[in-house]
Design a protein with these regions (language model features):
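Conserved active-site loop/cleft motifs that coordinate metal ions or position small ligands
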Residues: 5, 321, 341-343
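A short, conserved structural fragment
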Residues: 337-347
């Protein structure tokens, strides 16, 4: 099994572009953590292989009270089996939440990878998307984590803001490189229906950048990061040698995983499950011994297609093996290979 994903939906404020399930009601954090741990008990039969990674995402996991972070991670890692096999524990953070006490707590609990939502080093754009931190706080957060002994830091960047220029984006890339972090993820700004950002676009208050500029920004990202020693191992992800995200890499290889918490998703190799995305209903159901999720059984074609679309995002692509999947995949890919859009190389598509 790839690992455990725990969704922590709490946020102080909502960013205008975010489509993930989140809530600003922080008064029920303790009940929520207890519910997550109880869900893990209720689904113990789901975990039939060693856990290799643990990932706390959100929302904003760094918004949890310190004692609840400790309770959650300590319970997850209390088993000797997990302690022996788990190679990566990641927690997502906002730069403005990072201080000496929190960084020391992470180190003491065995958290060995931090993923920080920096997004941009422009204070103006940070205010536009309603991020709480400043560029200065992002720099300080990296320094604080380093002083605490955290050796694996990833930051997220966004490009393609309305009116953003190529020079401004290159400035963000170069600033990220100067921080010396081990991993950088970068995504084009998405206008998801239901978000305030999408509504602003519909009302004509902002404009998307044109597709050609977005393409040039993406290639500038690749060129500058690879020239600085980062390896692009997935469409949006770049890492120093030895610092790929183990947890996310397992997703792209279609390795089974379990998701805990409101709105979390799971995959067991044959079906997808997703928890209800209402925190109050989630807590109530779990407290009463019910797992509040829906399930979709996947036929072979759906599994194959899912595997193809995720694996083709990666540098290695899909490992080619003889068998039913091979026949299906190669028959589907034949035309694209002949047109030069896909390639077969060293046992991979």
């Amino acid at each position: 099994m790839a690992g455990i994903y725990i969704h922590i939906p709490f946020c102080k404020t909502r960013c205008i572009y975010c489509g993930f399930y989140s809530t600003t009601y922080n008064d029920i954090q303790s009940r929520y953590v207890d519910a997550v741990l109880k869900e893990l008990e209720l689904r113990s039969d789901y975990i039939n292989e060693p856990i290799e990674t643990i990932y706390l995402g959100g929302g904003t996991p760094s918004q949890l009270h310190f004692d609840l972070i400790e309770k959650l991670i300590s319970n997850l890692t209390s088993s000797s089996d997990v302690a022996r096999h788990c190679k990566e524990i990641t927690i997502e953070c906002n730069p403005d939440d990072v201080n000496d006490e929190l960084a020391a707590l992470f180190r003491r609990l065995g958290v060995n990878r931090i993923s920080m939502g920096v997004q941009t080093f422009s204070d103006e754009r940070l205010r536009f998307i309603r991020r709480r931190h400043t560029a200065e706080q992002a720099h300080k957060a990296v320094d604080t984590l380093r002083k605490a002994g955290i050796k694996n830091i990833s930051i997220d960047l966004i490009f393609g803001f309305p009116d953003e220029t190529m020079d401004e984006w290159i400035g963000d890339i170069d600033t990220a490189i100067s921080l010396g972090v081990e991993h950088i993820s970068a995504y084009s700004l998405m206008y998801e229906e239901g978000t305030p950002l999408f509504s602003m676009l519909e009302r004509g208050e902002i404009k998307e950048i044109d597709e050609e500029l977005s393409r040039r920004m993406y290639y500038a990202l690749i060129d500058r990061l690879t020239a600085s020693g980062y390896f692009q191992y997935e469409i949006s992800n770049f890492a120093r040698e030895g610092f790929r995200s183990r947890h996310n890499s397992s997703y792209w290889r279609a390795v089974p995983y379990i998701g805990l918490g409101a709105g979390a998703h799971s995959y067991d190799g044959h079906s997808r499950q997703w928890n209800i995305d209402n925190i109050y209903t989630y807590i109530y159901k779990v407290e009463n011994g019910t797992i509040p999720y829906e399930r979709e059984e996947l036929d072979a074609v759906t599994r194959y297609n899912d595997m193809i679309t995720t694996a083709l995002r990666t540098r290695e692509g899909i490992e080619i093996k003889e068998g039913g999947f091979y026949d299906y995949m190669m028959s589907s890919a034949k035309k694209l290979v002949s047109e030069g859009l896909l390639a077969v190389d060293n046992g991979h598509l």
